[in-house]
From Swiss-Prot:
GO terms, molecular function: acylphosphatase activity
Protein name: Acylphosphatase
Keywords, sorted A to Z: Hydrolase
Reaction(s) catalysed (UniProt annotation): an acyl phosphate + H2O = a carboxylate + phosphate + H(+)
Active-site residue list: R20, N38
Length: 92
């Protein structure tokens, strides 16, 4: 099965609540690689690559609100250029 690559912009209460770390943990459990990064506008950018089912499960976890303390108001996704990621990291 081929990998898919997407970028997701997550809006709501997603900074200062452990969102990136929880997303990293969830991605690692699913075998998804990429990164999570806080954006200046208060959103979080999540780039995810992996098999389509695993990436969709990660996106569904985010859609449902992510970690305790977070609130996801909006999730926008779009294709991302194929990029080799070894792990799922947190970027600063």
């Amino acid at each position: 099965m081929s990998k898919i690559y997407i970028v997701a912009y997550v809006y709501g209460v997603v900074q200062g609540v452990g969102f990136r770390y929880s997303t990293q943990r969830q991605a690692q459990q699913l075998g998804v690689t990429g990164y999570a990064k806080n954006c200046d506008d208060g959103s979080v950018e999540v780039v995810a690559s992996g098999n389509p089912q695993a990436v969709e499960r990660l996106m569904e976890w985010i859609r449902q609100g992510g970690p305790r303390g977070a609130r996801v108001d909006r999730l926008l996704t779009e294709p991302y250029p194929p990029t080799p990621f070894e792990t799922f990291s947190i970027r600063y």
